Each structure stands twice: as structure tokens, then as C-alpha cells.
């Protein structure tokens, strides 16, 4: 598929391993999780290996009182990159509520970018290309991939925001809380509209307007393209929902 070949070629220039200098950007990665199954528990532990990017600190925020919450704490204690583990009750705001809780209660001002992810994916190979391109593009919002399912948007399992635009993220999440009361309304009023609130944006993998993929979800409704992207490491993720 020619369009995929072009994307593979473009991705190669971002697959380098960066070196630490005095100008290396600092990154904070926030992992929102709900460790109510062993699959989700193991997803977080697995993903830490691939999120261990240069000059990157990690904060994990889990749901309180979940079955595998204590086990998660034990397993990640050996990862020095994890600076803090928080717990709050799970609610209808899902990952967005957890991410904003961290931003409101932890000092992120010393970081240049904040990356947001969750336990809905299992990462299968290094994603330096995502971090490298995010830094290179230096836009307010940087997603991993786009989608045209429902409307044009960036899927929210992995994205980054430049420090000076974090206030926009907090503002729109708080503003839309009155519209959110379920999983579907969280997707509708948080994920699908996120690109509307940022002036500059880009993503690592532009696939939303590929003719064979318009209006589809790459993880659930287009296995042909998904398998190609997985094998070429352009999309090195497995969705947990496909395993449980």
C-alpha cells in the first residue's frame, strides 16, 4: 500500500535514540488507569518499558479500591522513572478526570511537555518516534493518530500537550463536565472535540482520511489496515478490549 510505504519512510527519521544535553526537553507522562483486571495491570507494567523516554518522568493515577491496585504499586516500585502514584475514586469523567486531577495537584511547570496515556493499550515496541516528532513539531496538541469515526479527532489513548497550552486542556475538561455522565458522553464531549480547543496541532500518524479507512476505528473496524500498521511498527499497540 503506497500511502503506508510513505508513512514508514517518514517515520524512519524520527526513530532515533536522543542524547541528553542541557537543551533536552523535559517531559511528564501521566498514566491514567483502572486496575480492575490482571490484563490492565500487566498493560501498565509492560508500557512503562516503552514510555521510559529520555528526560521523562512518570506519574500514575489509578482508581482507588480496585482489585489489582496494591499489586500495581508493588510491581512498579522497581521503576525509578515513576515519581508518584495517586489514587482517586473512578467516575464518569474517566481518564480525563484523572489527568486533570494530576495537573491540578502536581507541579508540571518545570516540564516542557505533558504526555497523557492510559491502560487501554499494550505497547509492543519503542515509540521514540512519537516523542521525537512531538518535540520537533512543537505544537500545542500532538496526537498519536487521527480518526474520522464520528468526526475528525485524535484518539486519546496517547497524546501530548505543550506546557503553555495545558491551561486550555484543563479549562475545556472542566467546562464540559456538565455534559458528561457516561462512557459515551465522555468520548463525545472530551475525546471527539479535543482538537477544537488548540490553535496548533498535529499527530504522528495521519490515517483518518485514507480512502479505505474513512469513518472507521483503526483498532476495531479495519483489521486489514490495522495489521499492516502493526507489522510496520507504525501503530505498535494492541487494544486491551480486544483481549478481554
What feature does the model see in each segment?
Residues 1-244:
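ER/Golgi luminal nucleotide-sugar-dependent glycosyltransferases, focusing on the catalytic module
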Amino acid at each position: 500500500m503506497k500511502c503506508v510505504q510513505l508513512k514508514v519512510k517518514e517515520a524512519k527519521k524520527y526513530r532515533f535514540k536522543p542524547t541528553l544535553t542541557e537543551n533536552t526537553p523535559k517531559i511528564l507522562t501521566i498514566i491514567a488507569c483502572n486496575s480492575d483486571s490482571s490484563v490492565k495491570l500487566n498493560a501498565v507494567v509492560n508500557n512503562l518499558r516503552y514510555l521510559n523516554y529520555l528526560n521523562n518522568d512518570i506519574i500514575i493515577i489509578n482508581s482507588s479500591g480496585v482489585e489489582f491496585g496494591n499489586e500495581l504499586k508493588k510491581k512498579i516500585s522497581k521503576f525509578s522513572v515513576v515519581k508518584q502514584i495517586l489514587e482517586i475514586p473512578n467516575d464518569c469523567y474517566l481518564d480525563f478526570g484523572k489527568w486533570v486531577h494530576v495537573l491540578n495537584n502536581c507541579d508540571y511547570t518545570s516540564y516542557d511537555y505533558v504526555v497523557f496515556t492510559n491502560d487501554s493499550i499494550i505497547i509492543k515496541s519503542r515509540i521514540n518516534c512519537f516523542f521525537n516528532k512531538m518535540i520537533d513539531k512543537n505544537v500545542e496538541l500532538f496526537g498519536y493518530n487521527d480518526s474520522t469515526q464520528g468526526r475528525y479527532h485524535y484518539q486519546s489513548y496517547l497524546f501530548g500537550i505543550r506546557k503553555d497550552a495545558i491551561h486550555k486542556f484543563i479549562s475545556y475538561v472542566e467546562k464540559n463536565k456538565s455534559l458528561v455522565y457516561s462512557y459515551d458522553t465522555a468520548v463525545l464531549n472530551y475525546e471527539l472535540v479535543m482538537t477544537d480547543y488548540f490553535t496548533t496541532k498535529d499527530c504522528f500518524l495521519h490515517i483518518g482520511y485514507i480512502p479505505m479507512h474513512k469513518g472507521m476505528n483503526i483498532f476495531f473496524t479495519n483489521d486489514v489496515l490495522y495489521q499492516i500498521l502493526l507489522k510496520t511498527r507504525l501503530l505498535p499497540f494492541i487494544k486491551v478490549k480486544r483481549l478481554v
